[in-house]
């Protein structure tokens, strides 16, 4: 885990077009991209059932954020929040919710909790709201 400044988080999120941003903590730590990829494999191994309108994209994103909370505390996170959060976007003219993670390499990644896909967030979607 690497300490990252609020300024860096704001700069990275604003650069991809996020205007509605909620940061809940005063200090943040970023996991590595390798951790994020392993986390995706962990979630895929514990996959929950997709139920339209009941357990769909927004519930998957909340579940992933909760699991990230637990995993990062187990990995040694103390005295800071982390940079894995829930994100709303427009993708293919449809609303979608997934996760964004600013990693220790200072790259912002989109994380699809339903598949574990990790991809750079820039150009991935039209981002509307983020909560970290």
Give the residues covered by each predicted segment.
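A structural boundary/capping signal
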Residues: 1-132
């Amino acid at each position: 885990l690497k300490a990252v400044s609020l300024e860096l988080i704001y700069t990275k999120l604003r650069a991809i077009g996020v205007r509605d941003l909620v940061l809940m903590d005063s200090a943040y730590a970023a996991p590595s991209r390798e951790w994020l990829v392993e986390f995706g494999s962990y979630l895929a191994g514990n996959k929950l059932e997709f139920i339209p309108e009941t357990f769909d994209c927004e519930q998957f994103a909340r579940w992933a954020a909760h699991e990230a909370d637990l995993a990062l505390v187990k990995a040694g996170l103390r005295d800071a929040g982390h940079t894995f959060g829930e994100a709303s976007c427009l993708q293919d003219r449809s609303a979608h919710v997934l996760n964004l993670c600013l990693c220790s390499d200072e790259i912002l990644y989109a994380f699809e909790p339903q598949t574990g896909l990790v991809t750079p967030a820039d150009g991935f979607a039209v981002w509307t709201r983020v909560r970290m």
